[in-house]
A protein has these predicted regions:
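Periplasmic-binding protein-like
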Residues: 1-23, 68-69, 172-180
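Extracytoplasmic/peripheral linker and loop segments enriched in polar/acidic and small residues
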Residues: 5, 26, 43, 79, ...
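Paired acidic/hydrophobic, glycine-rich loop segments that form the ligand-binding mouth/hinge
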Residues: 104-109, 180
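Short, well-ordered beta-strand elements
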Residues: 53-62, 85-87
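Structural transition elements
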Residues: 14-47, 63-68
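Glycine-rich phosphate/diphosphate-binding loops that line cofactor/substrate pockets in enzymes
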Residues: 49-51
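Beta->alpha turn/N-cap motifs
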Residues: 90-91, 108-113
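Short, polar/charged alpha-helical segment
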Residues: 68-80
Length: 186
């Protein structure tokens, strides 16, 4: 996260702190993100039966802002013993392909109305999973925080609503539904 933010340039880009942007109502600053640790990743790969590493294919956008981040990710993955094979396609084609559930990993950047519910619903509620009739942008097929996302929508106490959003973020991070990389300073 930090390396990508540094590459893209502060103050416009900062390392992300959660699965929703830091300027959103309901943002949780420390949901339990793990640090970048290539040695630990290699050890975990070996323990999982991949002592020589692992290869993952990823369809990526040729759009400049996406392509550079994908190349940085490729280098970071390589440090951990993971070969990220990028298949770069034109941006509109990429949007079509990622909605066909073809990627194990999808890098995505988004701007939405600054309230946690929109991000949590579109990216992490099971009804938004790619392949469903109600699909939005849940590329990971995450379903661990549906209860909290739904409860927050109808909660009338703002403090309780924010706590539901915080708990949803903790669960999403704990289950690695997403690894947030950067946030823009817009």
């Amino acid at each position: 996260r930090e390396q990508i933010a540094q590459f893209r340039g502060e103050p416009f880009t900062r390392a992300a702190g959660s699965v929703i942007p830091m300027n959103n109502l309901g943002y949780l600053a420390n949901p339990g993100l793990l640090p970048h640790d290539p040695a630990k990743a290699k050890a975990l790969l070996a323990e999982a039966g991949y002592p020589n590493g692992l290869t993952i294919k990823m369809i990526g956008s040729q759009m400049g802002s996406y392509e550079t981040v994908q190349q940085l990710l490729q280098a970071q993955f390589q440090q951990s013993g993971i070969t990220l094979e990028l298949q770069q396609v034109e941006h509109a084609t990429w949007h079509q392909m990622i909605r066909k559930d073809l990627n194990a990993i999808t890098g995505y950047s988004a701007a939405r109305f600054p309230v946690a519910d929109i991000y949590l619903t579109q990216f992490y509620h099971s009804a938004s999973s790619i392949g469903k009739p109600t699909a939005a942008t849940n590329f990971s097929h995450c379903d661990v925080a549906d209860k909290e996302i739904e409860a927050a929508r109808t909660e009338t106490d703002p403090a309780k609503q924010i706590e539901y959003w915080h708990e949803a973020q903790r669960k999403i991070v704990a289950h690695v539904c997403a690894v947030p990389l950067t946030a823009t300073g817009q």
